[in-house]
Each structure stands twice: as structure tokens, then as C-alpha cells.
Regions:
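Basic, glycine/lysine-rich polyanion-binding surfaces/domains
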Residues: 3-177
Length: 177
């Protein structure tokens, strides 16, 4: 039985959507009702084409009133969203931020996260996110994952520090062997 697992999920893409129409635009992309989505909240969404066919199923993170990230497996959603926004006349900027994502999953992930960020990380609810710092590096941490266990995604905002973050988390997990 595994106790925790750290995965480099750099293959994941982040699509950043900002601008005055960002909230209206992300609602246009998915049939899921986002009207009550708060800043700091994450939602599992389905992106559909004009016929209702599923294009992708990312996690949507709301970082500000008009600031969103789509966190998805590799695909061309960035280009698709740019084309949809242009064609539909939305006032948004769509880009791919320089992010290095890691997943820390498993029953002991909470203890490891507390050793890294302190006890307040335990207050991060399922499918919520918050900006944090670790060793001078800016991260976005979400309580999401695929393991059916307690888990977190750590999205390092500057990919050049990815190896250092990975090693820091590995060291933090050693006492829990």
C-alpha cells in the first residue's frame, strides 16, 4: 500500500484566461454553471464544441474576479480557446503561463504539506486553491488530484525552480517512511 506519491506532471498544460470578459468567456466554454464560483475555488468542467461534443475535461481554477486557469492534460485547448474568443468577440487574453506542476497524493500528503507550509494548509478545502510561497518560490496550491486519497497539486510559477521544488518535497517526505 502506498503512503504518498510525488509525480512530476509537467505534461499538464495551464491555459490562463484574463481580461474584462474572462468570467463570461469561461462560462461560454462549458455547460457547467459557474455563476457561484468564488475566487480560490476549483471546478471540474467539461469543454464542449459547438455540437456538444467533449473536447477536454480540465480543472478550472479561479484566481481572481477575471482571472482563471484551465489545468488540463496535454491538448490544443489554448489555440481552440484563442480562436473561440476571437470569433465570439470576447475581451480576454489567453496564454500559457510558465508553470511547473507537481502532484503530491496519498494518505500522508497532508503531513508532508504541513511540514512544508505549516498547519494552515489543513484548512485548504477540497477543490480550492491558494497562492503560497516556499523557499522564496511562488506557488499556486490546489487540493485536487486523481488518487481517491488526500492530494494536492503544486503549481510552481517559475519552471526554472522545478527541480529544487521536487527535491524539497522529497526531503520533507523522508520522515514519513
Amino acid at each position: 500500500m502506498y503512503k504518498r506519491q510525488l509525480c512530476d506532471v509537467a505534461v499538464e498544460r495551464q491555459v490562463e484566461i484574463t481580461g474584462p470578459d474572462a468570467a463570461k468567456f469561461v462560462q461560454f466554454l462549458t455547460p457547467r454553471d459557474l455563476s457561484a464560483m468564488a475566487v480560490g475555488q476549483c471546478k471540474y468542467v467539461i469543454l464542449t464544441n459547438q455540437h456538444g461534443g467533449i473536447l477536454n475535461d480540465p480543472v478550472l481554477l479561479r484566481l481572481g474576479a477575471n482571472h482563471f486557469w484551465l489545468s488540463l492534460a496535454d491538448s490544443d485547448v489554448l489555440f481552440w480557446a484563442q480562436g473561440v474568443a476571437l470569433n465570439a468577440g470576447y475581451d480576454v487574453t489567453i496564454s500559457e503561463p510558465d508553470v511547473s506542476p507537481l502532484q503530491l497524493q496519498g494518505p500522508q500528503s497532508g503531513k508532508i504539506m504541513q511540514s512544508l507550509f505549516g498547519s494552515e494548509i489543513a484548512d485548504l478545502n477540497y477543490y480550492w486553491c491558494r497562492p503560497l510561497q516556499l523557499d522564496g518560490s511562488d506557488l499556486l496550491v490546489s487540493r485536487t488530484g486523481w488518487s481517491s486519497e488526500l492530494g494536492y497539486e503544486l503549481l510552481l510559477r517559475d519552471s526554472k525552480d522545478g527541480n529544487r521544488l521536487y527535491e524539497t518535497i522529497m526531503q520533507a517526505g523522508q520522515p514519513f517512511d
